[in-house]
Amino acid sequence: MQAVKLLQKVKRISTKITIPSLGEIKDWMLVAYSDAATKKIDHAFSVAGHVIFLVNKRTHAASPITWSSKKIERVVSSSLAAETLGVVKLIGVLYFIKEILKQMYGREQGNIPCLTLIDSKDLHEAVHNVKNSNDKRLLGDILQIKQAIAVDGIIDELRLIPSHEMMADVLTKGGRNGEILLESVRNGKLFIAGGTMIERSKKIEASTWRKLIQAQSEGFDTLEEAGLDAMIDSNKDIK
């Protein structure tokens, strides 16, 4: 019944899609919105959604490359877990896109920076701070996100934005208004919360994350020792 209503709405409302000129490759950036919702399928499984744009950071011209709304196979009980697994899935997609761009334009010119936007404060803090999640099963997933930022360079910045500016919200929650996403597709423009300037967080130090990843690979029962050492080193650098 809901599908019928959606089809009727689609037929009733006329729209258009604008494919703009994206200008010079040196001005390009990838902008990815990632969102998740818990227990939306059969009151058990969560849903992760993302939409990725190729954007000219000078003119704001933008074209969507891909989008997804899929069930998270692992059963989770918290929004932090769902959001974390959603970003982990997104990392694989971003890696694939960046490799294609490198093959098309060369490894140097095709190495386009990537800004990833989330609205989960808990996930943002877990990635940017040296602290453990209460859900020990998430440790490896959060480390994977940290590695994608600090070591692999797949994500250049993980930015926290207000929930009302989350374009992937409509891909994970029924009944949400997708007008801001539709408007961007119609106009071929994307205005990003916080601007197009990508800033690496001062809290993210590659050496810190390498220590955490090394600690996990060496089989620490917990990451407290590695986290404490990394924090001490970071404080020394600041001083």
How should each PLM-predicted stretch be described?
Residues M1-L22:
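Amphipathic alpha-helical
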Residues I52-L85:
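A short, polar/acidic, helix/strand-boundary loop motif
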Residues W28-M29, S46-I52:
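Short glycine-rich loop/turn motifs
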Residues V10, S14, S34-K40, L54-N56, ...:
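Short, flexible loop/turn elements at secondary-structure junctions
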Residues E73-K239:
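RNase H-like nuclease module associated with reverse transcription
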Residues P20, Y33-D35, V55, L117-D119, ...:
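Generic beta-strand/beta-sheet core signal
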Residues K26-H43, D119:
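Two-metal-ion RNase H-like nuclease active-site motif
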Residues T15-G23, L30, K98-G110:
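A short glycine-rich, hydrophobically flanked beta-strand micro-motif that places a catalytic Asp/Glu
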